[in-house]
Amino acid sequence: MELSEIRKNIDKVDTKLFELFEERMKLAECVARTKTSTGDCIYKPDREQQVISKFSEPADEDMKGYYEALIKRVMLISREYQYRILNEDTPADTEAAMLSADTVTVRFTYKGFPDNIVTAINDSGAKITGFTMNNSEYSISIRHDSCKTGIINLLKMIESESDNYSILVPEISVSDIPK
């Protein structure tokens, strides 16, 4: 087979991939809107692992690692898109809501998407009340009563153990937390 013919075939496959990707992103938008309306969180590590496991088992052993890398990247892009939609659906007074008396706002920068922080917050049982992002700067609002779970200390620990994060955590004391 000639190189030009191989390239034409690759172009056909790429066209199909683009169409499927667009379809997947439209479905991801539906997922984001559904999760937003039910108050569910976007990032579900168990679901992502289920998808990876489900489809990597029958894969050609030589391709398994490549497939896993591809699907992880697609899910990351999907998550970023869903968070953007969540951010668009947030009322215009997001900043005011994030600074309200019943929330603590954690601001941080990160190159890439902050799965560690989102997972840590979700795993702690803390309630995220707002999420905004602008390039690599993120703001997450957490209910004050979530601070009782030690989430602020957990976030500070993540920052101290990683060069990827710069976290601005407000200093709060127990007396600042509503009873």
Task: Give residue ranges: language-model regions.
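Domain-level signature for soluble enzymes in the chorismate/prephenate branch of the shikimate pathway
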Residues: M1-K179
